[in-house]
């Protein structure tokens, strides 16, 4: 190699070193100036740590609390042992967005051993990482093992026995964590009417209570024939036995307290009071519940409760089958009257939900400030008098957080 060729090689090498060094410098500078935009350690683009807070709405500082809840009702922090004996039980109330949430549970949770969901199959296999036992009891994992859309009364009496049978052994050490979703009662009612109008019946539901199903006299049908397809909203509202009325309270309450479906056991006013208070208590004691109208907040509280992360953030949909229903004020008032217990429960549930979100968000921000202050104190770039909380995050808006009309 002559001197000319040697000089050309040296110049080329120096040029490549300069280019590579410049690229690395720009990457480091870009990450420092705009952290979180490029995230090498976060699969599926899901932001972790402080950046992950930016996808969640800032609590409304002007929110006025309606009910008093002690800290024990606001604090939800479960050491969920997926390798142990813990089981999440999803109580799926019709037309609350439970199908979408149920799919999130089997397809969108970051797990050591993800659920095995195969095309064409209605159920996924959700085994624990260390053995072939399920950690999730839901429609998309175990199927309707306790009956179609089993309620609180059915699930609490059925789930332990079903799992013992499936796993061929009795386990008294299992911990069951019940979860559910609620929805604005008027929107939910209209969505159920639309669903029934298209031919849905849920007539295979068991409604098991105190060891038996209700008699035809206790639970008369609203229609003759195979289904109620084509029914008008007026017909739907006029049936006094319609299980759509106050469905959320009925499915969350302990029906044994009122004689199940036998309406003659307890006077109507007392029955309503017992059902509402029971539903409130059971909802309050659940490990977690979400609201259809607040998808991002629902995601946030679930993740913080169970220490499980979703791969993709939840989306809020406002285009639904119930959205196109034009109602006058009298009809809306009639639906609210038919669902008076659900209206009261939802008002209670929404307030508790918002207070839990505010409380948990406050704890997270406090923890981040402490970590940021600790990092700033030990930072080699720290100057005297500098540090503190750093630049505050701009407030984010709830993603379409208004009451939506359906699911």
From Swiss-Prot:
The lineage of its organism: Eukaryota, Metazoa, Chordata, Craniata, Vertebrata. Residues 36-407 are lumenal. 6-O-sulfation enzyme which catalyzes the transfer of sulfate from 3'-phosphoadenosine 5'-phosphosulfate (PAPS) to position 6 of the N-sulfoglucosamine residue (GlcNS) of heparan sulfate. This is Heparan-sulfate 6-O-sulfotransferase 1-B. It catalyses: alpha-D-glucosaminyl-[heparan sulfate](n) + 3'-phosphoadenylyl sulfate = 6-sulfo-alpha-D-glucosaminyl-[heparan sulfate](n) + adenosine 3',5'-bisphosphate + H(+). It comes from Danio rerio (Zebrafish). Residues 8-14 are cytoplasmic. GO terms for molecular function: heparan sulfate 6-sulfotransferase activity. Keywords: Glycoprotein, Membrane, Signal-anchor, Transferase, Transmembrane, Transmembrane helix. 3'-phosphoadenylyl sulfate binds at residues 92-100, 183, 191, 315-317, 321-322. It is an enzyme of class 2 (transferase).
């Amino acid at each position: 190699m002559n001197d000319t060729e040697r000089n050309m090689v040296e110049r080329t090498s120096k040029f490549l070193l300069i280019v590579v060094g410049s690229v690395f410098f720009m990457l480091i500078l870009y990450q420092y100036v705009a952290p979180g935009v490029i995230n090498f350690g976060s699969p599926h683009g899901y932001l972790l740590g402080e950046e992950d807070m930016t996808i969640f709405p800032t609590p409304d500082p002007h929110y006025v609390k309606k009910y008093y809840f002690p800290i024990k009702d606001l604090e939800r922090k479960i050491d969920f042992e997926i390798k142990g004996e813990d089981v999440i039980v999803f109580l799926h109330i019709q037309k609350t967005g439970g199908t979408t949430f149920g799919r999130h549970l089997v397809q969108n949770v970051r797990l050591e051993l993800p659920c095995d969901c195969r095309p064409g199959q209605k159920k996924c296999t959700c085994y624990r990482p260390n053995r072939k036992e399920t950690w999730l009891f839901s429609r998309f994992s175990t199927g309707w093992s306790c009956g179609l859309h089993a309620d609180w009364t059915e699930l609490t009496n059925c789930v332990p026995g079903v799992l013992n049978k499936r796993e061929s052994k009795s386990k008294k050490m299992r911990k069951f964590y019940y979860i559910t979703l609620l929805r604005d009662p008027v929107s939910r009612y209209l969505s159920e009417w639309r669903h029934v109008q298209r031919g849905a019946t849920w007539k295979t539901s068991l409604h098991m209570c105190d060891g038996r199903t209700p008699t035809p006299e206790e639970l008369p049908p609203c229609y003759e024939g195979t289904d109620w397809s084509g029914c008008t909203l007026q017909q739907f509202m006029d049936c006094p036995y319609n299980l759509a009325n106050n469905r959320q309270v009925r499915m969350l309450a302990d029906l044994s307290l009122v004689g199940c479906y036998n309406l003659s056991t307890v006077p109507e006013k007392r029955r309503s009071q017992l059902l509402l208070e029971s539903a409130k208590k059971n909802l309050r004691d659940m490990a977690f519940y979400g609201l259809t109208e607040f998808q991002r907040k629902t995601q946030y509280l679930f993740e913080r409760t169970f220490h499980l992360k979703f791969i993709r953030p939840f989306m809020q949909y406002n285009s639904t089958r119930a959205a196109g229903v034009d109602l006058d004020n009298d009809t809306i008032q009639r639906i609210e009257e038919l669902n008076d217990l659900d209206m009261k429960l939802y008002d209670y549930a929404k307030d508790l939900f918002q207070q839990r979100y505010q409380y948990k968000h406050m704890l997270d921000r406090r923890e981040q400030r402490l970590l940021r202050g600790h990092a700033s104190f030990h930072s080699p770039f720290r100057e005297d008098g500098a540090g503190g909380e750093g630049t505050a995050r701009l407030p984010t808006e709830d993603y379409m957080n208004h009451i939506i009309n359906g699911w």
